[in-house]
């Protein structure tokens, strides 16, 4: 997102996306609108992690196929990607031999989850939560360092800005 939205770069013309959370879905649409050919969105899980409306507006409206229970099993290329192979996975998320499909592409976009950026939080000695990768907070969202509050994606990754706004109001 940063390369396209802030830096203004076109990252590729023939794209495969791994991960179907909202960011992956929105990037599929954005890259299509920027002139790229998004060949497929592959998702390891048997369901998409994105909102239904994003599946419709970002994939279905642009005829981008979504392959559930699939993952990347091969990447071709030397200095630049020239192709990606995906395969269906079983209930244990292991590739099923014989289900491989190769896509010629110059870009593999990984949208496999977000981790809160907390370098500053760690530097001031805030205790971190191993589950969320965000800081531990009390019921008012104050960390263990007096006067330091945490909310939004620094606390844990949110899908909707409405939740971030509610946390911000609580934290003051």
Kindly give the residue locations of the regions a language model identified.
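Residues forming the flavin
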Residues: 1-172
